[in-house]
Amino acid sequence: MKIAILSTKQELSSTQRLKEAALARGHKVKIINTLRCYMSLSQEKPTIHYMGKELARYDAVIPRIGASITFYGTAVVRQFEMMGTFCLNSSMSITRSRDKFRSLQFLSRKGIDLPITGFAHSPDDIEDLIQMVGGTPLIIKLIEGTQGIGVVLAETKKAAESVIQAFLGLKVNILIQEFIGETQGRDIRCFVIGNKVVATMQREARPGDFRSNVHRGGTTKLIKITPQEREISINAAKALGLNVAGVDLLRSKRGPLVLEVNSSPGLEGIENITKKDIAGMIIEFIEKNAKPIKAYSRYQG
């Protein structure tokens, strides 16, 4: 098969692992800079050009779309879909996952348990919003933040009001979330491929922080998840339409809660801790599912 990996930074570990895994299984693979793709639409056919030439057809595309280029990146993925190319995660599923509140709305509609979450526009509603999520302490998040950036723990009502007012004053979209204190800065990353959780790890925040992201200095260790945690992870990925996802869970007193669903989960940390060839599993999934399809048939707006 001919496989394209969409990535703006080909040196990234996850991108290289996917390339290695594809080559090891006998496929032709090319890393394509998403931002150097440019597109043409006409009555006859959609095309993608790359560095001065029309891009060759590929059997499958692996989108590694960074949060900062979601709009353009998903447009490129959508163009591949219109050309009939199998995309590991669809443009629609990536878009759903990137807007934190929108993704939680999808999960809530499917009956998936979440931390109580609020969203408001007017500063006049701050006091009621704080009460809606159970009061302080509470978490304040940028709707399009990643890797723990733009996540604030407000421990008092006064602090919460000040931070929320500051964000709203800057016309920044934020969501407010209940603080699950019993997790003690720990969460669980479940790596989902298709309808299966293929790897799990626990992440723990560094001392003095509450964010467990490895990019923020958090540590990881192996963990065994429960059947309920496995089921909720698979259902969360399915609710957003993702074939591959990193589902972050919290173990709360009322059971597992889905914190977030990542459409471009990193491979390095979880492969290192579990010693599993997750990149190889992704390529195997593509082999089983990348069948020739009619052009335009995957485009859903």
From Swiss-Prot:
Residue span, ATP-grasp domain = 104-287
What GO MF terms are annotated?
ATP binding; metal ion binding; ribosomal S6-glutamic acid ligase activity
Q: Which domain of life is it from?
A: Bacteria
Entries under InterPro entries matching the protein: ATP-grasp, ATP-grasp_RimK-type, ATP_grasp_subdomain_1, RimK, Rimk_N, Rp_bS6_RimK/Lys_biosynth_LsyX
> Mind naming one GO cellular-component term on file for this protein?
cytoplasm
| Annotated Mn(2+) 1 binding sites | 248, 260
Give residues annotated as binding Mg(2+) 2: 260, 262
Enzyme Commission designation: 6.3.2.-
Listed Pfam families? RimK, Rimk_N
Q: Which residues bind Mg(2+) 1?
A: 248, 260
The free-text cofactor remark is: Binds 2 magnesium or manganese ions per subunit.
Binding site residues for ATP: 141, 178-179, 187, 211-213
Where, by residue number, does Mn(2+) 2 bind? 260, 262
- Identify the PROSITE patterns for this entry: ATP_GRASP
List required co-factors. Mg(2+); Mn(2+)
Q: List keywords of the entry alphabetically.
A: ATP-binding, Ligase, Magnesium, Manganese, Metal-binding, Nucleotide-binding, Protein biosynthesis
Q: What processes does the entry annotate via GO biological process terms?
A: protein modification process; SOS response; translation
Fetch the PANTHER family from UniProt: RIBOSOMAL PROTEIN BS6--L-GLUTAMATE LIGASE, RIBOSOMAL PROTEIN S6 MODIFICATION PROTEIN
Q: Which family does it belong to?
A: Belongs to the RimK family.
Q: Under what name is this protein listed?
A: Probable alpha-L-glutamate ligase
